[in-house]
């Protein structure tokens, strides 16, 4: 399937769901930026004290780090939201936040994200390009964990690497195809990202659903033979 077809499928999947997708992005933006700011202002003793301080308190940096880790399951759950859209489901915002009701899965996703980051970092120590290649190779890990919750983190990484053989360049070009839209978003002071991110995210989900999932059926047929 061509990249243009994946993008058309993404737009079709978002039809009637743009409001939910944009609202979800806005919520994530507010949680990421506004919540740490509010905590920092309150912890500083008020807006005037916060405004006058010259350096960011250490505890504020610690809070931001903890928050970033805590938001990993939510960020991944949003990618699953896009996958449900591609599969013609009817996901809503509460369904995305429901990931935190499953503590085991949440901690598994945090561990998977950290381990993936470590692997990519280690490859990047060699050169930047190997790091990029490996990040693409591991890119299907979280979708695979959704469809195969029985996978361990390492099994998901290995399976992602296996299924991305021959597809890395297409995946890379698919992301490059959004650069023009990204530049245009700069002229909207970033507001356009509220629409661009769901569009790109749903296209990535379509990539998985159309090019990665079918490999499983092919593997099953080989086993039967």
Regions found by a protein language model. Name each.
Residues 1-225:
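Hydrophobic alpha-helical membrane segments
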């Amino acid at each position: 399937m061509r990249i243009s077809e994946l993008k058309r499928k993404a737009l079709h999947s978002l039809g009637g769901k743009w409001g939910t997708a944009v609202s979800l992005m806005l919520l994530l933006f507010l949680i990421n930026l506004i919540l740490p700011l509010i905590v920092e202002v309150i912890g500083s003793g008020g807006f005037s004290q916060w405004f006058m301080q010259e350096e960011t308190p250490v505890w504020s940096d610690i809070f931001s780090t903890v928050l970033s880790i805590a938001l990993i399951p939510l960020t991944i759950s949003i990618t699953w939201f896009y996958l449900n859209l591609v599969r013609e489901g009817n996901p809503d915002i509460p369904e995305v936040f429901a990931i935190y009701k499953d503590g085991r899965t949440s901690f598994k996703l945090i561990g998977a994200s950290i381990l993936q980051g470590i692997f990519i970092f280690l490859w990047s120590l060699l050169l930047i390009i190997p790091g990029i290649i490996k990040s693409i190779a591991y890119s299907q890990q979280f979708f695979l964990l959704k469809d195969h919750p029985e996978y361990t983190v390492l099994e998901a990484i290995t399976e992602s690497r296996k299924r991305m053989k021959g597809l890395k360049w297409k995946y890379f070009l698919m992301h490059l195809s959004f650069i023009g839209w990204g530049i245009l978003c700069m002229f909207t002071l970033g507001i356009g990202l509220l629409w661009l991110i769901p569009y790109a995210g749903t296209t990535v989900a379509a990539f998985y659903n159309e090019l990665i999932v079918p490999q499983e059926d092919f593997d099953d047929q080989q086993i039967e033979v």
